Amino acid sequence: MNIRPLHDRVIIKREEVETRSAGGIVLTGSAATKSTRAKVLAVGKGRILENGTVQPLDVKVGDTVIFNDGYGVKAEKIDGEEVLIISENDILAIVE
């Protein structure tokens, strides 16, 4: 991938969602919701504070994160893959 996010932006790729229930039933519609887990592909240099210093991001490339899938999420196709460009503020947790 040849893209670098700016400031506190993070590029993530959504994890695949299981489309079958534990009993083998194929899930469709609202039962097959999009995953809010993703792999971090790239991170910006950090948030610029009021005093001009840069605060590095808490997430790093390779982290698996849980994110808020709402306002502020921008989907793009890069190298044929759909990725999301979000602010670090939209990341709720790092999965360890």
Swiss-Prot record:
Keyword annotations from UniProtKB, A to Z: Chaperone, Cytoplasm
Q: What is this protein called?
A: Co-chaperonin GroES
The record's function comment reads: Together with the chaperonin GroEL, plays an essential role in assisting protein folding. The GroEL-GroES system forms a nano-cage that allows encapsulation of the non-native substrate proteins and provides a physical environment optimized to promote and accelerate protein folding. GroES binds to the apical surface of the GroEL ring, thereby capping the opening of the GroEL channel.
GO biological process entries: chaperone cofactor-dependent protein refolding
- Give the Gene Ontology MF terms in alphabetical order: ATP binding; metal ion binding; protein folding chaperone; protein-folding chaperone binding; unfolded protein binding
In terms of Pfam families, this protein maps to: Cpn10
Q: Where in the cell is it found?
A: Cytoplasm
- As recorded in Swiss-Prot or TrEMBL, the protein's gene is named groES
Instruction: Read off the InterPro entries from this record.
Output: Chaperonin_GroES (IPR020818), Chaperonin_GroES_sf (IPR037124), Chaprnonin_Cpn10_CS (IPR018369), GroES-like_sf (IPR011032)
Record bears the keyword DNA-binding: no
Q: Which SUPFAM superfamilies match?
A: GroES-like (SSF50129)
Q: Which domain of life is it from?
A: Bacteria
Stated family: Belongs to the GroES chaperonin family.
The lineage, from the top, is: Bacteria, Pseudomonadati, Pseudomonadota, Gammaproteobacteria, Pasteurellales
